Structure formats: C-alpha cells, structure tokens
Amino acid sequence: MDAFVRGLHTYLLPTEPGRGPWGLGRGGRPWPDSAREVPAEALRQEPIDVVVLQRPEEIERVVELTGRRPGWELPAVFLEHNTPKREPVTERHPLADRDDIPVVHVTHFNDLVWDSGRAPTVVIEHGIPDPGLQYSGHVERLAFVANEPVRRRRIVGADLLPRFLGAGGIDAYGMGVAELPDALGLRADEIRAMGDLSPDRLHASIAERRCYVHLSRWTSLGLSLLEAMTLGLPVVVLDATEAARAVPPGVGFVSTNVDTLVAAVRLLMADPDEARRLGAAAREAALERYGLARFLRDWDSLLLDLPSARSRRAGVPSTSPLEDRSSDAHRHDL
C-alpha cells in the first residue's frame, strides 16, 4: 500500500468510527496528500472510477457503500496478496467463477499456483520506495522479520531459527515476536525480540545487522526481504515460492538446504567486506526489478485498460477517461 498510493491518482481510503478493519483510513501513515480519507457513508458522493478489492467480502461491502456493483457498474480489480491457504495447487480463487474483475497477483509464483478459473489475471510485482543505502552491518547478528511468527511458525520458517544460532545471534522484528524465545525454548539473548517498529526505525535497525535471513516456506514474497535488499543487506534465503526470482545468482545465498544457508551466514559473519559487496549487489538487483517507477507504470497500464462501467452496461466499446491516455487522464479516484 505504501508504494501504491505514490502514483498520480487520488486514493480514497474509507474511515469508520473506531478505525476498524473496514475503515482504517491512512492509519497515521505519512502518505502523500493524494491518499485521502473519506467517511464510509460519504463514498456515494465521490466520483469513483475504480475500486481495488483485497478481500472477497469487500464486493458486497462496496455495493452497500456506493450502491454500485463491482465489475459491472463500477470497474474493479482484485489484488491478491497471498498464496493459497488450503490446497497448494488445486485451490480455486474466490473470483474464479467471474470474468468481470481481473485478479492481480503480486508474484508469478502466486499466479502459477492459484486456480483462477475464468478470472483474467495479471502479475504486477512489488514496488519498493527506495529507503536509501543504509547498511553498516557492524552488529554481528542476523535480522529476521515476520509478523506473528509463533502462530505462523512453519509458514514463516521460525522453526528453523535455532539451527542458525551456531552462526550468530538473531534479532527478530515484527508483531508477536516477544513470544518467540519461549516458543522455541531459547534464551532471550539468543533470539532477541526487537518488537514491531515503525518503517523508519525498522530500516535503521536491521541495516546495522550483518545479514538478513528469510526463511518463509509458503508465503507470498515478503516485502521485508525486498526492503532489506534495498537497504544494502546481504540476504540468506530459503529457496521457496518466488525467492529465486527475487534473489538472482550472485546477489545472495538461496537454497533449500538449511545447512548451506547456515554456512553462508558463517561466511558473512567472518567476512564483513564480502557481506558489504553482496549487500550492494542485492540493492542493485532489488531496485532494478522492484523499483517504484516500474511498479507505478504497471498499475497505470492496468487501470487505464479497464473497461468503463458505462461500456459494460451498454455493451459498447468504452469511451471512459480510464482509456484516454492523455496526460489529464492519469489521475483517477481509487
């Protein structure tokens, strides 16, 4: 979301009393002014061009709030962040029986493993606002970032962390990391719970660690891995889902053999110059593939190609401003 709202559009973010899951708005984030909070009850008065859905239940919620049906009376896309939850290769996507709402996957792996049925699909890979080269690596510990690593233990690879302690201590970041040492039967100094930090504080802290370990078995490509790379950290990565595409040869260590990854951490701990060299290569690779400008161009291309609600109702080719590629058409309300 941090990257998405940095385009040339106006982004309408619903708010509700209590700022719950249906109405968080900006959530206190330092986003551009174009990311505008709107009370949910006022959405009917807004000239919405496109709605970006992220949960299946949002389809009915949009009808309630706008009086318009996504995909039919209101152009819509469904942004799918995740891998399938239940069946790795046979699970049908919630929109698989519809052809009026494109499904946007954030990785090619996700597009491969979801059964999307009739739904048109497109891959728009992550975009990362460049935090700048911050790596120092003077703290000889590993950085590990995951939310709720106890509940999601095997999913995020938290169960593998004890195997790395022979190479170096671990600093864990994210929501729920305070429970991690006890859950793994380890001392608090072996795995230090650093907490859920703001993005700026997180970046500054992990950039001091010697390297970053990414051990997820079955998640979509983690933004924390890409952020670590753009900060200039060398990365040690379990070769699952989209990892091999994110970390090409010569940029970091990628393997399904955990012993190989532990050996890589030992090398980085012993050779700070090599750690710095690999971190610089990781940063260059991440900015080339996951740069913000490419990400925003991809989204603009998709949004400009969406058929208008008018053309859907009338059954005629669209003349919507969404398909007018003049410079004035590059700002829309989302």
Indicate residue ranges for each PLM-predicted region.
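A charged, aromatic-enriched C-terminal amphipathic alpha-helix characteristic of glycosyltransferases
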Residues: 270-304, 308-310, 324
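Conserved catalytic-core segment of nucleotide-activated headgroup transferases in glycan assembly
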Residues: 113-116, 127-186, 196
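Short hydrophobic beta-strand element within catalytic cores of glycosyltransferases
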Residues: 234-237
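Conserved acidic donor-binding segment of nucleotide-sugar-dependent glycosyltransferases
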Residues: 249-259, 267-272
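A short hydrophobic beta-strand element within the catalytic core of glycosyltransferases
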Residues: 212-213
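Short alpha-helical segment that forms part of, or immediately flanks, the ligand-binding pocket
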Residues: 203, 226-230, 241-245
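Extended catalytic core of nucleotide-activated donor transferases of GT-like folds
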Residues: 9-100, 109-112
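Aromatic "clamp/platform" in nucleotide-sugar-dependent glycosyltransferases that forms part
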Residues: 217
